[in-house]
């Protein structure tokens, strides 16, 4: 099975669109390294401290806990 030039372009663009749709950080690249452990959400969750952020992250998955970092809610993996 051969990969056409058109399919290769679609595949590469898909990788970039998916990786830039996640929380951005200051490191260039695909962003896959840090995104497995962290997801950013609205800064409104951090108005009253970490509690709203933590509740939101725990509801998403029991393996996350919420932490407000630079006024943004981050869901961090408990195992990392």
UniProtKB/Swiss-Prot annotation:
| Record-annotated membrane-spanning stretches | none
Enumerate the UniProt keywords alphabetically: Antimicrobial, Disulfide bond, Fungicide, Plant defense, Secreted, Signal
Q: Its GO biological process terms?
A: defense response to fungus; killing of cells of another organism
Report what the protein is called: Defensin-like protein 113
Which first-to-last residue range defines the signal peptide?
1-23
Q: Which cysteines are joined by disulfide bonds?
A: 40-75, 46-68, 53-73
Give the protein family: Belongs to the DEFL family.
Q: What is the lineage of its organism?
A: Eukaryota, Viridiplantae, Streptophyta, Embryophyta, Tracheophyta
Q: Which domain of life is it from?
A: Eukaryota
Subcellular localization: Secreted
Instruction: Provide the Gene Ontology terms for cellular component.
Output: extracellular region
């Amino acid at each position: 099975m051969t990969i056409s030039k058109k399919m290769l372009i679609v595949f590469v663009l898909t990788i970039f669109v998916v990786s830039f749709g996640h929380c951005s950080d200051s490191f260039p690249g695909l962003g896959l390294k840090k995104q497995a452990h962290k997801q950013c959400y609205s800064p409104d969750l951090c108005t009253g401290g970490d509690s709203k952020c933590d509740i939101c992250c725990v509801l998403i998955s029991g393996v996350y806990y919420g932490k407000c970092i630079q006024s943004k809610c981050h869901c961090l993996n408990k195992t990392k």
